[in-house]
Amino acid sequence: MEDFIVISDDSGSESSAGTRSGRARRLRRALSRTPGALPRRTVDFIDLTRETRTRAKDRNGLCVIDLTRSEEENRPIATLDLTLEPVASSQKEPPSLQTCTNLSGKEMIEAQGDRGTQPAAQRVINNDPVDLDLLEENMFEGSRPPTSISQDSVYPPEPNCSSITYKGDLSFLTSLQLSSDVSPFSSTSNNSSSSSNQRTSLPCPQQDVPCQSQGLLCSLQALSYPLRGSPCPPRASSCPPQALSCPPQALSSLSCPSQTVQCQLQALPQPPQEVPCSTQNVPCPQQNIPSTPQDLPWHPRHPLYPSQDTLGLPQDVPGRPQNVSYPQDMTQLQDMPWSLQDMPLSLQDVLQSLQDVPPLLGDVPQSPEVMQLPGYMTQSSRNVIQSSAGVIRSSGGVMQPSGCMMQPSGGVTQSLRSAIQSSGGVMQSSGVTQSLRSVMQSSGGVMQSSGVTQSSGGVTWSLRSVMQSSGCMMQSPGGVMLSAGDMMQSSGGATRSLRSMMQSSGCMMQSPGGVTQSSGSVMQSLRNVIQSSGGVTQSSGGVIQSSSGVPQSLRDRMQSPGSVSQSSGDVIQSPRGASPASGDVIKSQGGMPRSLRDRMQSPGGVPQSSEDVIQSAGGVSPASGDAIQSPGGVSPASGDAMQSSGGVTPSLGDVPQSSGGVSPASGDAMQSPGGVTPSLGDAMQSPGGVSPASGDAMQSPGGVSPSLGDVPQSPGNMLESLGNTPNLSGDVSHVPQELLDLAKGRPKLSLNAVQNRHSPMTISAPSSPSCSANPLSQQSEFSSEKRPWLTVSNSSAREERSLPQSATPGSAQIQGQIAQAGVYNRPCLHRLKYFLRPPVHHLFFQTLIPDKDTRESKGQKLEPIPHRRLRMVTNTIEENFPLGTVQFLMDFVSPQHYPPREIVAHIIQKILLSGSETVDVLKEAYMLLMKIQQLHPANAKTVEWDWKLLTYVMEEEGQTLPGRVLFLRYVVQTLEDDFQQILRRQRQHLQQSIANTVLSCDKQPHNVRDVIKWLVKAVTENALTPPQDETQTSPGPGVLKTSSDHLSPQPNLARNTNQLIVCQLQRMLSIAVEVDRTPTCSSNKIAEMMFGFVLDIPERSQREMFFTTMESHLLRCKVLEIIFLHSCETPTRLPLSLAQALYFLNNSTSLLKCQSDKSQWQTWDELVEHLQFLLSSYQHVLREHLRSSVIDRKDLIIKRIKPKPQQGDDITVVDVEKQIEAFRSRLVHILGEPLVPQLQDKVHLLKLLLFYAADLNPDTEPASER
């Protein structure tokens, strides 16, 4: 089968894009019309219209050319030129292109040419034809991206830049050595002006310098990449090539400050797969170099370029670049050592137009593609590049775009999630500026971009938008400039970018007008760590660079003399200053890396982190989210940062600053003496030049700063535990007490006060005298004061929930918004009521806002769990594997599938009520039962427990079962859910409910008596009784609040268990009152049963718990009424009313046992308290229509029917005053002494309650004598 192509003769000039598009369409039509046409495979479209020689034409006027030969069928045709003249290999490409066929010993060829004079051509790569004419048509029509390009690729023409003025020396290009092979690249394409159509810029291999984008000068068209198989240069030791894996994400770009340069910025091509070891002087042992996975496909998900109008760019930019398509087999760059020691740095090396649209690092994660110029290092997101010559500054300052970073005029620039480090110092180039979103720079050094702030005399940071003009920024020589975003900068030395950290290992140098970072300084980003100081650089993305020449590959530890590089965010170590990467970093001294997720400490520093961050002396910078600082300037990472006096400056939102001219950013700023300018927000200043972070961070003058403001450091999961964490070393400075006294009038708190206040969050004091829990306590104090919703209770479960939330960067702000907005969110309120339910007779209001799950489950047919899945469950039951049974059922139960009844019975009887299961299995079983109950509520026919089983659990041997309380909660939940279900759907069928079956006073009065008996027994348990002086009472129903500070753990646990049992049994009694549709009759019957049990309760505190935990106000009124009626010498015939309460005041005596005979007034005090309970509950009975049936009550409440006037409620102010005065006189006469203040207060409160209940105006009452 022969392959052929057809070219139209009458296509016209190819300078017009529209004509080309028309010609391409005619080509397709001609191919479809030609009989026997075969799919194109390894062919080219060749435009023959410019040639003078005649071609044979068919009857349709089309030239048919056979380009296929038998010996060439298996290899693609890269370029076919059918002209008569012999063509050299270097001439087959257009003037500005470079081929990469065999470049091992050749020099790079550069040329310039007019784009308009270049013929159209097609390239064939990997047996896949790429029609550049069609490609351009697609580019203009906004269709699919170009096809991928692989080995033996030929590169399309570069844009026409001949009109651009270029001043500089390109002689360094002649010294660049080309390597031997070509690795796969991804083609990129951008739009240009209508007069000149730019093609895709593809890289040419070169040894050390990454290919620059098309925005550079045409003479600098292609900077080569290190090639795939090239060995180390002769100068360096024999280091085998490192495997690279590069996610072809966003493309880095540069912008040069030269005002005479205007070139269209193009996309940066992909780096090669493997990079030679290019370091010169350090041996690279081959046995320690691991391999890296190669096939890591990456799929671009977001557009790489923002629109021009959103970047503040000039409006005459020709067009926005197209999206870039990458091959699926493109490997990600993991480990790429770079060396630029042989590359000179020149001002005019790189010229980039200010009109270019750079990639948006904020939306698209930057790939480890590196634009590298001689002596200049640019770092994209997730990549680390280090230049031995230093970091380039622009003249008058450095401009960093709104994406994430800025560059001080002293010279350190850190990108979003990346780090740039100079091991030998900072070199200044009069005009190199790195742009993240858009860069505009003036020759004066101060420029304003859409997100960039620049000052020639200081350091300015910008988060996403920075406003700067040459005259409107605050600048102090050697000081700090604060931008509008959430950035800050310290003239003392380090600059920390968004979610990244720069750390100085104790060695910071400051140059006039900026910040210079010495070889001992470290900048650490959230996911990328670069470290110099002996040549150690780490990146979480896997790029490791060592100025000493020791590269480390992914997830393997390698150590060379003097420097250790650890990759992949796992471990990094260097003897002088290590920067652990994000997540899991461990550092030890002497250059020995530790393995992942082990905490280790080296002398001179305290490594402590919520995750796995270890620090060493001389300055350690932990990464994302969890940081501890050691002396010498340690700066924690993302979110809320702390800064030590050593000169570390974090950024992002909540920024602490150190003394010596540090200015925190927006939000809450702290200011320390020494030329610090606080930003908007609240400024807190601490003595000694220590500035706590905004909101939550604290600093110590010795360089010890606690971790992020939102991360409380507790012994359980973060910093130190008594058994497995080394103590703080002696080098950690002791934080003075004055640091607790910050601005805003915060009172001084001693260490004991702080530790007692946040006892779950503090750690035990270490043995070393110079070590203390002060930083942790201080930070915990500030965190709790400013974020009360993060307060950790004594519950370990709440500790486990709150700590991971606060460890996330920015979680404080998010939770604050939820706390403010969620209160007024009706669905959130509804869900809250679902877990915090009021008494039973109010529960029907919960259905006013149906749950989303309820709405979605309507109309779906319920089915049992499929047999195949059920067989898996039965297998676990047969194998006696309860945990597997519970876990399978947890997965299989859904709104559409319910478990069989025998399975539920097995869960209850054999797992939940088993005496041999662990607590975890019991909790899993309980959660499974709750899930089944929520999705498929039990009814009277399907319920799997009975009263006999409940009696066994509450009275017999079941009292010792560990799942007893969980089972009782499940029982009450089934009673309540069934009661509410019938109440909502079938009001008239309450007698069919489970509660009516087991708790009806008419049908099962003995069951109600059993509940009362269990309730009184739980109340009178010894463990439930606290000392009298610890009791706090409340007049209304609720849980008794008692202090348990002096109780031992075991009695305290039993006491809490009894409290849970009391609350559940009180809920059962409240259901029993409502279930018979006659609440008054039911409450009278239950009160008669209770009377004898209440008299047997020995202590007042126990009786108080009995009444305060009672949920039914009607039942409490009836019980108290019966007690008072029996205590009166002459019983009254008045019904339950206010007049009856006044009668009880002066005619009743206490029938209840007094706890002490010496304090007779306490008996009367309890009597007055019970009268208060009676009046309070009586108001609930009236206003909530509790005497009416629960079926009728809903309509009464919705219609807001006022309660009917009751006989005996028409009392007056005179009646109240007369009875209260008579009661006081009676007490004085009986006690023989004046009333104690406590009793006087309760009598006065009783009078106010009577006024309120009778709706009397207190202003008309005479002056009361107390």
Curated annotation (Swiss-Prot):
Region (NSE5-like domain): 865-1200
Quaternary context: Forms a heterodimer with SLF2. Interacts (via SIM domains) with SUMO1 and SUMO2. Interacts with CAPN3 and CTBP1. Interacts with SMC6 and ZNF451.
GO MF entry, a single one: SUMO polymer binding
Keyword Nucleus listed: yes
Protein name: SUMO-interacting motif-containing protein 1
Region of interest (Disordered), residue spans: 1-35, 183-206, 532-732, 756-812, 1024-1052
Compositional bias (Polar residues): 560-571
Location relative to the cell: Nucleus, PML body
Phylogenetic lineage: Eukaryota, Metazoa, Chordata, Craniata, Vertebrata
Cellular component, GO, one term: sarcomere
Chain span(s) of sequence motif SUMO interaction motif 2 (SIM): 64-68
Gene this protein is translated from: Simc1
